[in-house]
Each structure stands twice: as C-alpha cells, then as structure tokens.
Amino acid sequence: MNYIPELKKYYKDSVIKELVKEFEYKSIMQVPKLEKIVVSVGVGEAVRNKKLLDSAVLELSQITGQKAVKTKAKKAIAGFKIRQGQEIGAKVTLRGNAMYEFLYKLIHLALPRVKDFRGINGNAFDGNGNYSFGITEQIIFSEIDYDKIERISGLNVTIVTTASNDKESKALLLKFGMPFSN
C-alpha cells in the first residue's frame, strides 16, 4: 500500500466535504486544492561570498527534503553590484506528497517555534488565490543545526492553490490549520 500524508488524507476525508457545504459547489471538482508550494531564499551577499549560496542551497534542501535549485538574477542592478545571470538565490518547488508533508511540518512544527508567535498575516493573498509569506529565521525548522549554520537567513513561502479568489483560498488554508492572525 502506498503512503499518503496525513494532511492529504485529511483533505480528501474532511476538507472537501466542508468546502462543498460552505461554498455550495455543484461538483467536488470545483473545490480548491493545493497545486504547489515554492520555498525560496535570496542571498544578496552571494555576490561577495559564494560559500553563503552553497550553504543556503544545502539548508533549503534539508528543510524541504528536495534538492534546491540556484536562481539567477534576471537583470543587472549596479547599486547592489549584481550582474545579469549571476547566481543570487535558491528555490524549491514542492508538489504531491512532499508538498503536503512540508505544509504539515510548517503549520504544526516550525511556526509554533517562532518566538512570540501570534499567527501570520491573513491579508497576503494575491487576488488569484495564492498566498505568500516570509519566515525571518530558517532555524525554526528542526532539520537545521544551529551550530553549523553560516548565518541566520529568512525564506519566502508561496502556496499556490487552484482557488479562483482569495476568500476560497483562505478558507482552504484555514481548514488545513494555517494560523492566521486576522
């Protein structure tokens, strides 16, 4: 038998039924679902120190359980001494079971470890049902060994859903247990 993540099982068993009732969908195919989660980190100092970018890629891979890809600058920015095509960050795109595992780990294990945590901003939707937020310290994830990190850095998380608007997307994420402050 194949392994099914807890959050995916919960989505299929409970969330779909609750959202059909709440939004009165005619078919369960209309119910919004998670499409992908993109976790990225920008390393501005990588211009001067390539070792920081390599450690960011390693940390991102440890956090997500999937190999991170280095990202390149789209255009040159003289003020930051960045040339076009220069590697300045890393990202991971999670889909399928890995996506549900990461979301579970984020909601139930990592975010509660943030000092003075009161929830994340519930207004950071983009109008198309996608939600983005930043995490200020990568050390909230248990996979990161505090003694072995080069420097404390933040990361960006974008949750892409099939919802057509923000209201449906927020309802979906609330059902998953996303700790919104408002």
Curated annotation (Swiss-Prot):
At the highest ranks, the source species' classification is: Bacteria, Pseudomonadati, Spirochaetota, Spirochaetia, Spirochaetales
Q: Which superkingdom heads the taxonomic lineage of this protein's source? A: Bacteria
Record has Ribosomal protein as a keyword: yes
Protein name according to UniProt: Large ribosomal subunit protein uL5
GO molecular-function annotation terms? Answer: rRNA binding; structural constituent of ribosome; tRNA binding
* Pfam families assigned: Ribosomal_L5, Ribosomal_L5_C
Alphabetized UniProt keyword annotations: Ribonucleoprotein, Ribosomal protein, RNA-binding, rRNA-binding, tRNA-binding
What InterPro entries does UniProt report for this protein, alphabetically? Ribosomal_uL5, Ribosomal_uL5_bac-type, Ribosomal_uL5_C, Ribosomal_uL5_CS, Ribosomal_uL5_dom_sf, Ribosomal_uL5_N
